[in-house]
């Protein structure tokens, strides 16, 4: 099994953490790799590899790859090759909807999946109470809130369900 991840939303101009960025990628990817699921992280040239903490990705059953600065066609091909994909509310879900239309998992925090998501995906939102009031304002005007995200276990269970693994 292979999962594509796009962990980061666009870098903010003010240098602050984008409120869309899920804070628990390292833990989630550890769980997937431990389960024998291969993970491919994609990002732009400015993105860094997710933080694995003290355990390196090669200490697992599954394999981890990090690919940067890919062309749209290359990303579309990866979407086709992977069994599912996971992203924050960012570019990947929109590219997928336009070019591939493969069901995936989108992690929302303060943006509303009823506005920015697609019903064909599994849109994960912890609580509507965390949605920002002005959905169309710039993200620089929104503070990062780690508590606005679903837990690692919620995402992990969603992945296993998509992969039909129990």
Question: Model-flagged regions — what are they?
Answer:
Residues 119-166:
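Leloir-type glycosyltransferase catalytic cores
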Residues 20-110:
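Donor-binding and catalytic core of enzymes assembling or modifying cell-surface/extracellular glycoconjugates
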Residues 12, 48, 113-114:
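Flexible, glycine-rich phosphate/dinucleotide-binding loops
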Residues 99-129:
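Gly/Pro- and small hydrophobic-enriched strand-loop and loop-to-helix capping segments
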Residues 11-21, 51-52, 137-145:
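Short, flexible/disordered intra-domain loops and linkers
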Residues 3-5, 32, 39-42, 105-107, ...:
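Hydrophobic beta-strand residues in large extracellular and virion-surface proteins
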Residues 16, 70, 146-150:
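Short, surface-exposed alpha-helical recognition segments that flank or form part
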């Amino acid at each position: 099994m292979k999962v594509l991840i796009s962990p980061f939303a666009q870098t903010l101009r003010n240098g602050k953490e984008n409120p869309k960025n899920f804070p628990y990628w390292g833990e989630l990817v550890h769980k997937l790799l431990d389960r024998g699921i291969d993970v491919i992280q994609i990002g732009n040239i400015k993105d860094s590899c997710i933080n694995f903490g003290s355990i390196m990705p090669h200490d697992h059953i599954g394999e981890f790859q990090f690919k940067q600065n890919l062309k749209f066609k290359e990303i579309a091909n990866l979407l086709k090759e992977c069994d599912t994909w996971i992203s924050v509310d960012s570019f990947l879900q929109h590219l997928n909807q336009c070019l591939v239309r493969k069901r995936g998992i989108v992690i929302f925090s303060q943006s509303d999946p009823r506005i920015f998501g697609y019903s064909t995906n599994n849109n994960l939102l912890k609580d509507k109470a965390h949605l920002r009031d002005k959905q169309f304002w710039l993200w620089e005007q929104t503070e990062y809130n780690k508590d606005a995200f679903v837990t690692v276990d919620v995402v992990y269970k969603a992945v296993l369900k998509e992969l039909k693994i129990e």
